[in-house]
């Protein structure tokens, strides 16, 4: 079911509207003054969490899904059954350097899944296809599902960050990305903008 839910994320727009909600925070990782990767943290809504846990624990409903730490086996199942499919959608991650689209890698590093209270959380590092210098022009990073089946947005109270070698003098902020409207122009996604 969880693999199906995320596979449907790029289904026809006519059937879209959020079925899953995800809060995110992104940290841009610098090396030698350029952004080389993005560390992303995702928190799923409680309904999706129950569905995901029910699938891997073979139970039905919240009353039978114990909110407890995930086992290594469960983390492996989540990665195989739900997370790995997101590579087909660039992990819902969109990057532009000076207005030009930048590719991300198909494989992530440092994948983890965990429980954060009653919510399933993912964390992972997503390399950029090529390092980007935000000093050459603003770097914009958005995490959203183009079909709007999954509503992805910045986590409240958690600001985007920059870190690493050469990140000094750079700052990240959340902006309304009016250049990439969703759901027939009705939804303005949020994006992280880095300027140095």
What is each residue range found by the language model?
Residues 47-128:
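Structured domain cores in non-transmembrane regions
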Residues 28-37, 111-117, 183:
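Short, solvent-exposed beta-strand/turn "edge" segments of beta-rich domains on protein surfaces
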Residues 17-50:
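Early extracytoplasmic/domain-onset interaction patches
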Residues 1-9:
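Bacterial N-terminal signal peptides
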Residues 22-27, 105-111, 176-180, 190:
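Short structured motifs
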């Amino acid at each position: 079911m969880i693999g199906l839910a995320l596979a449907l994320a790029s289904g026809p727009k006519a059937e879209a509207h959020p079925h899953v909600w995800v809060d995110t925070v992104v940290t841009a990782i610098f090396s030698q003054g350029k952004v080389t990767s993005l560390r992303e943290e995702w928190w799923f809504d409680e309904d999706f969490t129950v569905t995901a846990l029910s699938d891997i624990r073979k139970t039905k409903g919240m009353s039978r899904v114990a909110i407890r730490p995930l086992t290594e086996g469960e983390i492996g199942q989540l990665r195989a059954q739900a997370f790995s499919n997101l590579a087909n959608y660039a992990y819902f991650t969109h990057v532009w350097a000076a207005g030009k689209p930048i590719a991300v890698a198909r494989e992530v590093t440092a994948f983890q899944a965990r429980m954060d209270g009653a919510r399933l959380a993912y964390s992972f590092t997503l390399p950029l296809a090529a390092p980007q210098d935000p000093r050459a022009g603003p770097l914009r990073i958005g995490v959203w599902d183009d079909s709007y089946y999954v509503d992805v947005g910045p986590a409240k109270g958690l600001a985007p960050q920059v870190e690493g070698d050469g990140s000094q003098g750079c700052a990240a902020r959340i902006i309304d990305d009016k250049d990439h409207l969703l759901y027939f122009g009705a939804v303005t996604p949020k994006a992280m903008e880095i300027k140095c």
